[in-house]
Amino acid sequence: IAIQGGXGYLXQPGDGYKYA
């Protein structure tokens, strides 16, 4: 599920989204 975040997660860039 893609949610709004502040930094990168699971190797994703810090585009403002996190994947959980």
Curated annotation (Swiss-Prot):
Cellular component terms per the entry's GO annotation: extracellular region
**Top-tier EC class:** hydrolase
Q: How does activity depend on pH?
A: Optimum pH is 8.0.
Q: Which GO terms describe its biological process?
A: defense response to bacterium; killing of cells of another organism
Annotated keywords? Antibiotic, Antimicrobial, Bacteriolytic enzyme, Glycosidase, Hydrolase, Secreted
Any one GO MF annotation of this record:
lysozyme activity
- Keyword Coiled coil among UniProt keywords: no
The protein's Enzyme Commission number = 3.2.1.17
- Compartments, record wording: Secreted
Q: Does the keyword Nucleotide-binding apply?
A: no
- Superkingdom of the source? Bacteria
Describe its function: Has bacteriolytic activity.
Record protein name field: Lysozyme
Native organism: Lysobacter sp. (strain XL1)
